[in-house]
Amino acid sequence: MTREPHRLSRRTLLKQGMGIFGLLAGGLMSSSSLAEILKEPTPRQSLGPFFPDEGDPIDAIRENHAIGLPISQANDQDLTYVKGRRGKAKGQVIYLKGKVLSAKTGKAIPHTVIIMWSASASGRYNHKKDDGMLKFPHPTTGEIIHRTYDAYFQYWGRAVSNEQGDYWFKTIVPGFYPIDLEAGQYRPSHLHFQLFPPEHPKLVTQLYFRGDQIPNNELNQKLLPMDVVILDAGLTTIDLERVIVDYAPDASGEILDGLVGHYDFLAPN
């Protein structure tokens, strides 16, 4: 069933300061419509060509050498360094925190395996297929950007939600990169995810960035509505809003080495 583009997600309502009860009281939305919105799963998007399957990475980073464990699940959830290497990943550090919930019931889903992967801060993947356009001019400033491999960036990681459905990752903001310079097409900064919620279908999606301290934030916001992956997935304006995460300094003051974003995955039924 095609989603209606005028529908508002819970996250959008809260961001606009409208409030759920205000919508109900003001007659802008029926209780049945609200219930339907709160049950919409996280929008699906493509896996992409750079998932870390065995034999694909340029550098086969494997922190966990357990027999039978796929390389995509062999690294921890802190991607800002590689165990055994003296150095830190380049780029703006971020923390992504949230829960894995059932879209149908709203209940937490523990023991969900979450695989996350992305490009480096300069927009280069640890993947043999990512071998083109290794330098390009910034579309706004004209500065030449070199898409370089970062030996201190982990590139992919694995988290498992706890009994309350909580998960977290620590990583860097990946760079945007060109997919067709002549057509002026670029992929905005994004994180890839593959989730395996117990007793639920697998979820594959991507999350995007927004925030005053996010590198190339203004450019990323311009690129998002015309992104080929978003368009191919058939995301509406509201769907897109649901997969953009706002990042800012930690309001509690506990996290001092990076920006913090929050996102709850809603697993399909």
What are these regions (language model features)?
Residues 1-12, 21-22, 26-27:
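N-terminal secretory signal peptides
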Residues 8, 18, 194-196:
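Compositionally biased, intrinsically disordered low-complexity segments enriched
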Residues 16, 250-251, 268:
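Peripheral, solvent-exposed domain-edge segments
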Residues 34-244, 256, 260-268:
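Beta-strand-dominated extracellular/periplasmic modules and repeats
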